[in-house]
């Protein structure tokens, strides 16, 4: 006897079983779920996979999102602690790891998270060998390097979320001070996503007008308007939010979706993300730092040769040295 489905639907041809734009988020903590909802809100995938070691939390998050699928463009949301569920992913977003504690430097997190990655990354490659990996876990620059080493992927397919959020914070804070919209205020934070990041004051502009030409002391200790404080606020902002609410999640989630949109839609937009910088600006070691990079459907396709002042280059090299001093001691990569 025919089922209700058979009575209702007459099949014409077998549907596709392989997703076109499958995205996986590894880690369903505060950051992972903020990434997931931001990706879904932009309609960037036809299938979303969630992975975590906490089964009840994982199932609960999956069900909660599934119940909202009527209001989304993505109806297939799956989850499992087994990374097999990630098979055929186009992008894998890695947010897994131990959480940064109040007052803890991102660099202090490194060894605990390296051990987590040694399990996750080989599994990702087993099930999605053609994927691009976007690393979000902190310290993001070192863990992007770790991912690159463990995955065996070419460097254009391993990207760190890097200073995309730092630059957004920078533009927001400057725009507030100037009374204009952040999209009209252009500025870049490069280097480490963290305490040694570099504010490129020489490139800050509004409508093409260099702010440093209007105020040559901008970003220095001699500046009566104390614009240097804006960069300090960028560096301290994550610590401030963690102090107030215990973690950061919404801004990084939105930032990650912004990066994925450039990839999925082949937009060729320029983002400050973490990439392998050996040979650039006199950096001699294999470190990942944020530089302005073009993101397209092929991954991270090129780096913009931003004209930096000597002191900015020196800061960038110092940022590289800071990371290498920890990276060089990592074992089993």
From Swiss-Prot:
Pathway: Fermentation; pyruvate fermentation to lactate; (S)-lactate from pyruvate: step 1/1. GO terms for cellular component: cytoplasm. NCBIfam families: L-LDH-NAD (TIGR01771). It catalyses: (S)-lactate + NAD(+) = pyruvate + NADH + H(+). This is L-lactate dehydrogenase B chain. It is an enzyme of class 1 (oxidoreductase). Interconverts simultaneously and stereospecifically pyruvate and lactate with concomitant interconversion of NADH and NAD(+). Its EC number is 1.1.1.27. GO terms for biological process: lactate metabolic process. GO terms for molecular function: L-lactate dehydrogenase activity. It is found in: Cytoplasm. The active site is at residue 193. It comes from Pelodiscus sinensis japonicus (Chinese soft-shelled turtle). The keyword Transferase does not apply. SUPFAM superfamilies: LDH C-terminal domain-like, NAD(P)-binding Rossmann-fold domains. Belongs to the LDH/MDH superfamily. LDH family.
């Amino acid at each position: 006897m025919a089922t209700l489905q058979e009575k209702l639907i007459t099949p014409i041809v077998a549907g596709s079983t392989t997703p076109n734009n499958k995205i996986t988020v590894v880690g369903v903590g505060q950051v992972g779920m903020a990434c997931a909802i931001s990706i879904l809100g932009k309609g960037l995938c036809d299938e979303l996979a969630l992975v975590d070691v906490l089964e009840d939390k994982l199932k609960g998050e999956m069900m909660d999102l599934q119940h909202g699928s009527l209001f989304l463009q993505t109806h297939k949301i799956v989850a499992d602690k087994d990374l097999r569920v990630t098979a055929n992913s186009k992008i894998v977003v890695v947010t897994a790891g131990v959480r940064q504690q109040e007052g803890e430097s991102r660099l202090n997190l490194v060894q605990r998270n390296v051990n987590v990655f040694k399990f996750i990354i080989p599994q990702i490659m087993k099930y999605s060998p053609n994927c691009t990996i976007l690393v979000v876990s902190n310290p993001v620059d070192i863990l992007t390097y770790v991912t690159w080493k463990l995955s065996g992927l070419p460097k254009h397919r391993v990207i760190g979320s890097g200073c995309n959020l730092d630059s957004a914070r920078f533009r927001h804070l400057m725009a507030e001070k100037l009374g204009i919209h952040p999209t009209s205020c252009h500025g870049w934070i490069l280097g480490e996503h963290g305490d040694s990041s570099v504010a490129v004051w020489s490139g800050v502009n509004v409508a093409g007008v260099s702010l440093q030409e209007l105020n040559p002391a901008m970003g220095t200790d001699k500046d009566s308007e104390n614009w240097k404080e804006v960069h300090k606020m960028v560096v301290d902002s994550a610590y401030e939010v963690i102090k107030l609410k215990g973690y950061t999640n919404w801004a990084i989630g939105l930032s990650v979706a912004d990066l994925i949109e450039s990839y999925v839609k082949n937009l060729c937009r320029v983002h400050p993300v973490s990439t392998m910088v050996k040979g650039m600006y006199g950096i001699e070691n294999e470190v990942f730092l944020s530089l302005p990079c073009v993101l397209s459907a092929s991954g991270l396709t090129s780096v913009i040769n931003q004209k930096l002042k000597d002191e900015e280059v020196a800061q960038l090299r110092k940022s590289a040295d800071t990371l290498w001093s920890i990276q060089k001691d990592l074992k089993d990569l």
